[in-house]
Amino acid sequence: MARLKARYNDELKAKLQEELSIKNVMEIPRITKITLNMGVGAAATDKKLLDGAVADMQLIAGQKPVVTLARKSIAGFKIRDGWPIGCKVTLRGDQMYEFLDRLISIAIPRIRDFRGFSAKSFDGRGNYSMGLKEQIVFPEIDFDKIDRIRGMDITITTTARTDDEGRALMRAFGFPFK
């Protein structure tokens, strides 16, 4: 079992139940999935850029990403309907907790000039979205082997009903907010 999952089941559930004054154990907020998305805008002109993004995402997430396609043609962005423009991975279960553990304990401390994530990035239903400017903060990525620095979006979906519940859950996991 993942270290963070065991910690959640052993310590954090009881702490959250007391903090949020929840009576039913099934109402305690938990993380359901983590979605990683890497948009590669230049993939419309150079298809090899997408291969590098897919390889990086596979190293970071530990599973093969799905290539995302453009939903409609936009002349201003020079993309057509159905063209590959990025990749995404959805993590659940033990892989999700392993990734979250690596993100909190290894990757976030390696971000340059980091002063904490914004606590305003919740969507109103307890889900948190954030962006990373470079993929090299993850130890799986070898700096010498990457073709270019890419950013990514990370969305953490929870069962929390409000932003305050989601914020309490993320803080309990040790997420650094401003």
Swiss-Prot record:
Coiled coil: none annotated. PANTHER family: 60S RIBOSOMAL PROTEIN L11-RELATED. The keyword Ribosomal protein applies. The gene is rplE. It comes from the Bacteria. Keywords: Ribonucleoprotein, Ribosomal protein, RNA-binding, rRNA-binding, tRNA-binding. It comes from Acinetobacter baumannii (strain AB0057). GO terms for molecular function: rRNA binding; structural constituent of ribosome; tRNA binding. This is Large ribosomal subunit protein uL5.
